């Protein structure tokens, strides 16, 4: 084995092979490595196969022309709630009394009458129309069998059912010589009928229910300033 001043532990020195200069050795260029596929890029390529790109999707799913089909705007929930919730109109006491008075006179109003009443009460014709519709419905429901009537609706129903019961009319009676004049030759017959009906002398007026009966001379007794006038029963009528 050839010894040298420098110990070498290479394979050639151990096998006693001649050393070759490193400059004369053929250089081996590194073989180009094939680029390894990036897993992220492979995943993106696979996803693109399932889903179209932005350009392709814009072509495929492009909406139709606005001129051919009107675009429907989604209604917001707030606007729907505002439409459902209508503001309740509060009528004043004077307006309510006038509406009730007119309802007792006339349940159905024509368009000119509604406009006239609305301008009088400073309301709109629609408000007057709705008030009359609601009041007719309440009155109809109150008249249904087994329904509890409110005082206002009951009074309104009584006014329409029997208007003559709430009005009393006093008919004047002409008296001649202490006897009522019935006109024509039937004075005695009328006097007898009045006595049988009223059970009082003909000079006394028939008392009405709820009113006290006054005699022939007691009418002027209520007014002391007119007591000097003669009693109506003593005045003789010249026919």
From Swiss-Prot:
This is Homeobox protein Nkx-2.8. Residues 1-11 have a biased composition (Polar residues). The keyword Manganese does not apply. GO terms for biological process: axonogenesis; cell differentiation; DNA-templated transcription; epithelial cell proliferation; liver development; lung development; negative regulation of epithelial cell proliferation; positive regulation of transcription by RNA polymerase II. One of its GO terms (cellular component) is nucleus. It comes from Homo sapiens. Pfam families: Homeodomain. Belongs to the NK-2 homeobox family. GO terms for molecular function: DNA-binding transcription activator activity, RNA polymerase II-specific; DNA-binding transcription factor activity; DNA-binding transcription factor activity, RNA polymerase II-specific; double-stranded DNA binding; RNA polymerase II cis-regulatory region sequence-specific DNA binding; sequence-specific DNA binding; sequence-specific double-stranded DNA binding. The keyword RNA-binding does not apply. The gene is NKX2-8. Disulfide bonds: none annotated. Residues 84-143 bind DNA. Residues 21-32 have a biased composition (Basic and acidic residues). Keywords: Developmental protein, DNA-binding, Homeobox, Nucleus.
């Amino acid at each position: 084995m050839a010894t040298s001043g420098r110990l070498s532990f290479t394979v050639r020195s151990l096998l006693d092979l001649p050393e070759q200069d490193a400059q004369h050795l053929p250089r081996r260029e590194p073989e180009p490595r094939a680029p390894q596929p990036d897993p992220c890029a492979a995943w993106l390529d696979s996803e693109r196969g399932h889903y179209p790109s932005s350009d392709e999707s814009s072509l495929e799913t492009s909406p139709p022309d606005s001129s051919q089909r009107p675009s429907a705007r989604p209604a917001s929930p707030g606007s729907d709630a505002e439409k459902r919730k209508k503001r309740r109109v509060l009528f004043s006491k004077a307006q309510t009394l006038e509406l009730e008075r007119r309802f007792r006179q006339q349940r159905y109003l024509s368009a000119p009458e509604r406009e006239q009443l609305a301008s009088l009460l400073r309301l709109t014709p629609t408000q007057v129309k709705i008030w009359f519709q609601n009041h007719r419905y309440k009155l109809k429901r109150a008249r249904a069998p087994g329904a509890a009537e409110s005082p206002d609706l009951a009074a309104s129903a009584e006014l329409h059912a029997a208007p003559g019961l709430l009005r009393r009319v006093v008919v004047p009676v002409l008296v001649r010589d202490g006897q009522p004049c019935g006109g024509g030759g039937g004075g005695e017959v009328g006097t007898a009928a009045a006595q049988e009906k009223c059970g009082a002398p003909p000079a006394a007026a028939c008392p009405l229910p709820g009113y006290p009966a006054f005699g022939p001379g007691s009418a002027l007794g209520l007014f002391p300033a007119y007591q000097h006038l003669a009693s109506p029963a003593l005045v003789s009528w010249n026919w």
